[in-house]
């Protein structure tokens, strides 16, 4: 009889979130050799999108957990969401503990992952935990919390985070920098960390249409419009750059979208537009750009490769990134000549970034785009990275 794998996934298709599609790909791949069950909450991300609750796939079982959801960026609601989903996932785990051989623990960060990890330890079920963002550290970025308060918060939350990493068979991280940092700060053996880049469905990026001929330089941002995306900073810098015959297109939804739309009105900008695209439309939309943009707050991009950067590079376009200068994003963009980075949270630096690309010839921008595509195909595809996770899980199940 096939061994049974339980994937606990805080987000899952049809939600248009990177982790949702990573876990879907993982479920499909594992279902070739194992019985796979996915536990997921009602789909709610991104805000503003509408979904059907009965989404399923014939290759594996999907169980919809009727738990509290709170997609808004508000701490108490998010805590309640994480706690409720994880507790109900643990109820399922307890009821089926004698049937389950392995858990992929991708619930909500901190207390959510901790609750599930404790249940796995209690029932002696091996698990892997993936880490996309570093908590509690990222809760304290771009906030005006006094230093003494940060120390108190860290002293409470760091042990919560350390528990589910220490007790996991492997911890999947998305960059060498992240693995090094977590191993050092959590005092956990570096060999426990598995570094696997986030991937995209690279099939969607095949046979992309050629960019439309235009004298206009088109800057684009495609992704969530939330407080960590710094879309307001992009708008202000683009306005100040005042590049002739240029356009800024912003695609996505999120809790800061209305504020950003109001900012555009207040600044009197007529060359900034907003839209929303499905995941399938993203490659085509991005192929229309002259330059793709991302802007991460200080401390948010120094230890990981943003998932949207993978999508940007696969699109074969140059990238302007406002990020930490000791980050993997800078290492790739400038080391592989795929784009330009500027310091984070600095409007004047981003203004200069816009102007830099405007001063390049179209041929120079196209060459950067070719470099982007070449790097992505070598390092960021599903074929390259999914198998690393699958092989790790298979090796754990073989030992059991």
Locate the predicted segments by residue.
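Carbohydrate-associated surface elements
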Residues: 42, 177, 198-199
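Nucleotide-activated donor-binding/catalytic signature segment of Leloir-type glycosyltransferases, i.e.
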Residues: 243, 249, 258-283
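Conserved donor-binding/catalytic core segment of Leloir-type glycosyltransferases
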Residues: 212-229, 235-238, 249
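Membrane-proximal helix-turn-helix segments that form the acceptor-binding/catalytic region
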Residues: 118-122, 151-171
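A short, well-ordered alpha-helix in the C-terminal region of glycosyltransferases
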Residues: 356, 363-378
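Acidic anion/phosphate-binding donor-loop and adjacent secondary structure
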Residues: 183-184, 191-195, 199-216, 230
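N-terminal subdomain of nucleotide-sugar transferases
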Residues: 1-58, 400
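Nucleotide-sugar-dependent
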Residues: 229, 276-285, 292-313, 318-331
């Amino acid at each position: 009889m096939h061994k049974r794998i339980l994937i606990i996934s805080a987000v899952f298709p049809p939600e248009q979130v990177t982790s949702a599609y990573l876990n879907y790909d993982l479920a499909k791949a594992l279902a070739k050799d194992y019985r796979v069950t996915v536990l997921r909450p009602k789909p709610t991300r991104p805000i503003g999108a509408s979904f059907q609750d009965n989404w399923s796939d014939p290759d594996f079982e999907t169980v919809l957990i009727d738990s509290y959801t709170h997609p808004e960026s508000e701490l108490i609601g998010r805590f309640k969401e994480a706690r409720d989903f994880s507790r109900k996932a643990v109820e399922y785990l307890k009821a089926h503990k004698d049937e389950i051989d392995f858990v992929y623990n991708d619930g909500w960060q901190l207390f959510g992952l901790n609750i599930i990890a404790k249940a796995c330890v209690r029932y002696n079920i091996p698990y892997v935990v993936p880490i996309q963002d570093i908590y509690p550290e990222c809760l304290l970025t771009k906030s005006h919390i006094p230093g003494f308060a940060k120390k108190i918060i860290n002293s409470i939350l760091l042990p919560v985070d350390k528990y589910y990493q220490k007790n996991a068979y492997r911890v999947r991280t998305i960059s060498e920098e992240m693995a090094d940092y977590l191993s050092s700060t959590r005092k956990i053996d570096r060999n426990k960390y598995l570094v696997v880049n986030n991937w995209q469905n690279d099939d969607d990026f095949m046979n992309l249409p050629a960019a439309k001929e235009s004298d206009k330089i088109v800057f684009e941002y495609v992704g969530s419009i939330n407080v960590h995306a710094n879309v307001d900073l992009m708008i202000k810098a683009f306005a100040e750059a005042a590049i002739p015959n240029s356009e800024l297109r912003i695609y996505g939804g999120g809790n800061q979208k209305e504020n950003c739309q109001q900012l555009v009105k207040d600044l009197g900008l007529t060359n900034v537009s907003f839209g929303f695209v499905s995941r399938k439309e993203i490659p085509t939309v991005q192929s229309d750009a002259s330059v793709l943009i991302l802007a991460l707050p200080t401390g948010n991009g120094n230890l990981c490769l943003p998932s949207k950067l993978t999508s940007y590079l696969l699109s074969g376009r140059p990238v302007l990134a406002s990020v930490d200068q000791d980050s993997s994003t800078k290492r790739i963009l400038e080391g592989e000549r795929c784009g330009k980075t500027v310091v984070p949270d600095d409007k004047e630096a981003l203004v200069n970034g816009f102007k830099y690309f405007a001063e390049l010839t179209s041929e120079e921008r196209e060459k950067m785009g070719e470099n982007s595509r070449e790097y992505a195909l070598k390092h960021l595809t599903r074929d390259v990275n999914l198998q690393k996770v699958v092989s790790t899980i298979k090796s754990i199940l073989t030992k059991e």
